[in-house]
């Protein structure tokens, strides 16, 4: 039988492992002798966000605890905590803006009775009444709002660690108060925060506000042990030498320069416009069922003005982490259903690849310090009408998500003619109002953005932002770095495959059915299947190897692998059991039959669901228990062979993909039956089920438990002529009991006779199967 090709591929597809391993070793050996490009990321390698030395980050590396520094007077920067370590009693620090803010912190050692002490604050002698009855040090924060005013105690910090903190942030000055280890922050208002300076009389540390939790930890629990050794020597604050430079939005800055190379920093304001792509596929039949509504990558090209310069940009939008939904209105052919529709939600990501014709993208080969910031954008779904032949149409309507910038890397963006070195912006999602529904169905108030109409009639969505990167380029701007065009090979192959799929699908009308039956009866092997493409044996062997490598990853091969594991488990189980029947039951478990029917109720919908699940496994069951009848795989392989011979575009590179796709997608609607005496039980992949007598073709009640037993013990037969066609044939022409048996068993000779007699019912059924052989 023609399905021998599939069994042969399944058997031999794993024999190419050694060949793959040898080829891989050779490839790795070749690639490992490339020249080390130095400390710069290339566009073909990820990740690209990296900084100095071993820290993989593009941002400036700031230490959590910077110091200690020697006592000094300076104007502290905003958003940085000063952590001051007091080693004696007296004034710890003084701070003022000479306008509306004068404050000082003084320390008092433990166990001090109430007494008056003299302190020099801002050059003047001040007297304070102090007391400390605890075992810890006390720090008194005194304050006045004018240069001539009296100081009053505003806050007190009781600490065993002898640390105080001070921060300029948000128009206020923040300090710690309370008692360690539960000290907290409080603030004082000022109208002139930026001009506040500080006189520090002790060693101190600097901590960024982003690490405030660490500062809180140090205040309450003390510094790390390494900071308390005599080997730590405080430095002058001048050694910190922080230079603050705010880059302009759109400019090119020369960072460094040698004779041949220079580092250029590119800062750019950008406008990103993008749109979602989608694909809506309708099933054949009466027009009430849809196969798939899915997201696809979409390109968009546009122009905009940036600082008086006209910029041409190109974006590619794609999604990742989609959620698969489905809707099933019932098992009748006129019941509306969607096998699968995709929705993006909180667990999804949107990727937008951006390129423009500015200098920043001209030599994007070695890049570092890549950073970006983009606005968020809300995407709201529109309406899609499911145009049914009769009745009111269901409408998928609504849905919304908001895109939030989550990162940027380098990427390669493909167009029809060239590949572009681009920036890939990654966006996380949050669901938003409104929810989406399928009007006139039970699907209501779901959240996310479905793929039916994600653009809602808009030509594009738009967001603005900016990016900055440092690129290593040639000193002479006349030199150009070529883009690695080899990465377009797969893109070219995809275009070839799309053209080939269209050709294959159009050839279905040209297949002669009588020749197809004869071809389906031949034992097609790999040589005879592929010999129509190349005449030499060596090239045919090479193609067969390529097909096996691809076929090994197909759904059919994966299912066979899972079945083999289950049979191994069954064998080990049988060796520990005295009952042969238990062995058979265990072996049948891989079909999920026994498990599926164990809790079935009398509900028709439940039985429909179970039979649909079971029927998808019966292809493998039929394949390992080959009968003399014609199978769906025989027809599938025969159609594949015919189309390969007729095709003008098939080649060595496209053949593996086509054969693998054919094994998975040809004839998706399959019916299988088991036969017991004069009783037939039949199910199909759509969840329909029949039980009937051979003599009369009258239906009888379908017993799913009995069906499960028959599947275990009896051969599974492809229902080439299904029950509906048999019934139609008997009602219009009348068939004998022997003819009915032969058609039920898919006897190829009887099928050929009916076709040669131009029986319209049988011919129509075979034509429908051929039309289902689509990619």
UniProtKB/Swiss-Prot annotation:
UniProt motif (KID motif) ranges: 643-645
Site (Cleavage): 230-231, 240-241, 246-247
Position of sequence motif YGL motif: 447-449
Protein name: Outer capsid protein VP4
Organism from which the protein derives: Rotavirus A (strain RVA/Human/United States/DS-1/1976/G2P1B[4]) (RV-A)
One Gene Ontology term, aspect cellular component: host cell rough endoplasmic reticulum
Source organism phylogeny: Viruses, Riboviria, Orthornavirae, Duplornaviricota, Resentoviricetes
Gene3D superfamilies reported for this sequence: 1.20.5.170, 2.60.120.200
Residue span of region Spike head: 65-223
Record GO biological process: permeabilization of host organelle membrane involved in viral entry into host cell; virion attachment to host cell
Keywords assigned by UniProt, alphabetized: Capsid protein, Coiled coil, Disulfide bond, Hemagglutinin, Host cell membrane, Host cytoplasm, Host cytoskeleton, Host endoplasmic reticulum, Host membrane, Host-virus interaction, Membrane, Outer capsid protein, Viral attachment to host cell, Viral penetration into host cytoplasm, Viral penetration via permeabilization of host membrane, Virion, Virus entry into host cell
Segments forming a coiled coil: 483-510
Disulfide bond sites: 317-379
HAMAP family xref list: Rota_A_VP4, Rota_VP4
Family: Belongs to the rotavirus VP4 family.
Region of interest (Spike body and stalk (antigen domain)), residue spans: 247-478
Motif extent (DGE motif): 307-309
């Amino acid at each position: 039988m023609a399905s021998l090709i599939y069994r042969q591929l399944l058997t031999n597809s794993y024999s190419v492992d050694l060949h793959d391993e040898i080829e891989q070793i050779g490839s790795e050996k070749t690639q490992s002798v490339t020249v080390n490009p130095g400390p710069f990321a290339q566009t073909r390698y990820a990740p690209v966000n990296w900084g100095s030395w071993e820290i993989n980050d593009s941002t400036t590396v700031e230490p959590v605890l910077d110091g200690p520094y020697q006592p000094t007077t300076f104007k502290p920067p905003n958003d940085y905590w000063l952590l001051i370590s007091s080693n004696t009693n007296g004034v710890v620090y003084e701070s003022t803006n000479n306008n509306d803010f004068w404050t000082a912190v003084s320390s008092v050692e433990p166990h001090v009775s109430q007494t008056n002490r003299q302190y020099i604050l801002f050059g003047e002698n001040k007297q304070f009444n102090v007391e400390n009855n605890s075992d810890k040090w006390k720090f008194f924060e005194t304050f006045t709002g004018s240069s001539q005013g009296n100081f009053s105690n505003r806050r007190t910090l009781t600490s065993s660690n002898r640390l105080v903190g001070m921060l300029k942030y948000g128009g206020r000055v923040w300090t710690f108060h309370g008692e360690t280890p539960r000290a907290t922050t409080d603030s004082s208002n000022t109208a002139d925060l930026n001009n506040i300076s500080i006189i520090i009389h002790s060693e101190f540390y600097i901590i960024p506000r982003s690490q405030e939790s660490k500062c809180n930890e140090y205040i309450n629990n003390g510094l790390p042990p390494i900071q308390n050794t005599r080997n730590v020597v405080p430095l002058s604050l001048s050694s910190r030498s922080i230079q603050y430079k705010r880059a302009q939005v759109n400019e090119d800055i020369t960072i460094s320069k040698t004779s041949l190379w220079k580092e250029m920093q590119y800062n750019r304001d950008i406008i990103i416009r993008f749109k979602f792509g989608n694909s809506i596929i309708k099933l054949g039949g009466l027009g009430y069922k849809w196969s798939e509504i899915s997201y696809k990558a979409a390109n968009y090209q546009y122009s905009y003005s940036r600082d008086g310069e006209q910029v041409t940009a190109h974006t590619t939008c794609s999604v990742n982490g989609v959620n698969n939904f489905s809707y099933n209105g019932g098992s009748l052919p006129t019941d509306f259903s969607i096998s699968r529709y995709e929705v993006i939600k909180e667990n999804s990501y949107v990727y937008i690849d951006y390129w423009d014709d500015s200098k920043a993208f001209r030599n994007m080969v070695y890049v570092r310090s890549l950073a970006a910031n983009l606005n968020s954008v809300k995407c709201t779904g529109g309406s899609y009408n499911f145009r049914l032949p009769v009745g009111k149409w269901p409408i998928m309507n609504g849905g919304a998500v908001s895109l939030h910038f989550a990162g940027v890397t380098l990427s390669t963006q493909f167009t029809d003619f060239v590949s572009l070195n681009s920036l890939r912006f990654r966006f996380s999602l949050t669901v938003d109002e409104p929810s989406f529904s399928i009007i006139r169905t039970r699907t209501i108030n779901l959240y996310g953005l479905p793929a039916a109409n994600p653009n809602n009639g808009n030509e594009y969505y738009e967001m603005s932002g900016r990016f900055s990167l440092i690129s290593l380029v040639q000193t002479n701007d006349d030199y150009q770095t070529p883009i690695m065009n080899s990465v377009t090979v797969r893109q070219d192959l995809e275009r070839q495959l799309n053209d080939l799929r269209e050709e294959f699908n159009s050839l279905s009308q040209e297949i002669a059915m009588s020749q197809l039956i004869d071809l389906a009866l031949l034992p097609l092997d790999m040589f005879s299947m592929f010999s129509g493409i190349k005449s030499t044996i060596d090239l045919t062997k090479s193609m067969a190897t390529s097909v096996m490598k691809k076929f090994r990853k197909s759904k059919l091969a994966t299912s066979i692998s899972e079945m083999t594991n289950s049979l191994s488990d069954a064998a080990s189980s049988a060796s520990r059991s005295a009952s042969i029947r238990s062995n058979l039951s265990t072996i049948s478990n891989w079909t999920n039959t026994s498990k599926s029917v164990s809790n079935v109720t009398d509900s028709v919908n439940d039985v429909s669901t179970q039979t649909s699940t079971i029927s998808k496994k019966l292809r493998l069951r039929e394949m390992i228990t080959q009968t003399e009848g014609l199978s769906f795989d025989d027809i599938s392989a025969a159609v594949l062979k015919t189309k390969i011979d007729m095709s003008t575009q098939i080649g060595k590179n496209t053949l593996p993909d086509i054969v693998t796709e054919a094994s998975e997608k040809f004839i998706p609607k399959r019916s299988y039956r088991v036969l017991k005496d004069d009783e037939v039980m039949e199910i199909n992949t759509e969840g329909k089920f029949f039980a009937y007598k051979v003599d009369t073709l009258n239906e009888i009640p379908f017993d799913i438990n009995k069906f499960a037993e028959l599947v275990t013990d009896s051969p599974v037969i492809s229902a080439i002529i299904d029950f509906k066609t048999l019934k139609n044939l008997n009602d219009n022409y009348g068939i004998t009991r022997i003819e009915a048996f032969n058609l039920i068993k898919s006897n190829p000779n009887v099928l050929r006779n009916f076709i040669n007699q131009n029986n319209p019912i049988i011919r129509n059924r075979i034509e429908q199967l051929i039309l289902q052989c689509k990619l």
